[in-house]
Amino acid sequence: MGIGQQTDQVATGIIGAMESEIAAIREAMDDVRVSTISGMHFAEGRIAGRLVVVVQCGMGMVNAGICAQTLINGFGVKRIINTGVAGSLTPELTINDFVVSTDAVQHDFDVSPIGFARGEIPYTGMVAFPADKELRAKAVAAVKSAAPASEVLEGRVCSGDQFISTPQQRDAITTAFGGVCAEMEGAAIAQVCHLNGIPYVIIRAISDDSDDMSFEEFQAEAAQECAGAVLAMVRGL
């Protein structure tokens, strides 16, 4: 039984795809207990007295969906924060700026030949899954506190099982969905949270311009910046 099922205090799930995206968050935890489920290591504990479960899900939509559902069913979390890096889809954002999700879409999901809109998840009537307004506000405030020199933009997160590395890919996504950043997990987490009635928010620091030029150079720094913002957010919950 997870910590969120053992107490009346609300437990927060925190998901990052890569070790660099969660390392600083995990290091800030007290009273840590680790469980391994589906090859993922779920660290239960506290940050500034707040109950958290922190996990590296691995890259991609399937990993993210499995992880989010496990946090809900196995650990009883009542809200989920997705942290990490992303590629910018807009000239408004540059390296180490931030995105806080208004909603999230799967940019490579397409069953339009059988009558659904591009990106629409059949039988849900939804293309985009909205983030929680209260968590969004707390996330924006946390970014401004933790990284005052960075810009923070609220907007649509576009997720898919591909690394966006060309202007052609970037333009196709923005034309279809109007998103502000691209990554590989957020929309899966958003869909799982929607189906379970769990509030969520995605916080992403920009590591590249959705090209292949800067990701490796700036990924670690951007991941660290985002982790700092998440820590500030958790301490304010």
Residue ranges and their predicted role:
Residues 2-69:
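N-terminal short beta-loop-beta anion/metal-coordinating cradle
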Residues 70-74, 92-93, 190-199:
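Alpha-helix C-terminal capping segments
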Residues 198-200, 205-237:
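Regulatory input/activation interfaces that engage signals or partners
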Residues 28, 134-149, 192, 228-236:
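Generic non-transmembrane alpha-helical segments
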